[in-house]
A protein has these predicted regions:
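Thiamine diphosphate
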Residues: 2-149
Length: 149
């Protein structure tokens, strides 16, 4: 839900060209990747992540969908998910489906920094995603030599 704010102009492009695109927004109450990073490396208090940090808010997606002319579907819990997805996929034209998830849900695999024994943080290559595999297992699965730094 936070990251879709960075590409709102694309909603108009989809409507303008009458594309049959179904947009599924995973609403985790803000910028969840930033939230996870702050919790994993620094703990509380959170800053700049969403409602739980108290310094950011986001628009109502149902109202935003209507402003762009999209039909809107919402699933607030697991029991509503299958019906919401089926309804969204069955509709003609573009549709926005908002799926509410917990702010505590972890997303994996994901690109993540590694903390070295000396405390410094490094960004590994994109193929080395969290949860991190042992070096031996990564080496076995690579078809090209790994870049180690």
């Amino acid at each position: 839900d936070g990251s879709i704010q960075m590409n709102l102009q694309e909603l108009q492009t989809i409507i303008h060209h009458k594309m049959g695109i179904k947009i599924f927004i995973i609403n985790n109450g803000g910028y969840h990747s930033i939230r996870q990073t702050q919790k994993n490396f620094f703990g509380e208090p959170l800053v700049g992540v969403g409602y739980d940090s108290g310094d950011l808010s986001f628009p109502d997606m149902e109202k935003l969908s209507a402003a762009y002319g999209y039909p809107y579907v919402r699933a607030e819990h697991n029991g509503q998910l299958a019906e919401a997805v089926e309804k969204t996929l069955a509709m003609e034209g573009p549709v926005i489906c908002e799926i509410i998830v917990s702010t505590d849900q972890n997303f994996e695999p994901k690109s993540s920094a590694k903390r070295l024994p000396d405390g410094t943080l490094v960004s590994p290559p994109l193929e080395d995603m969290a949860p991190f595999l042992p070096d031996e297992e990564m080496d076995e699965n690579m078809i090209i030599p790994r870049i180690k730094g």
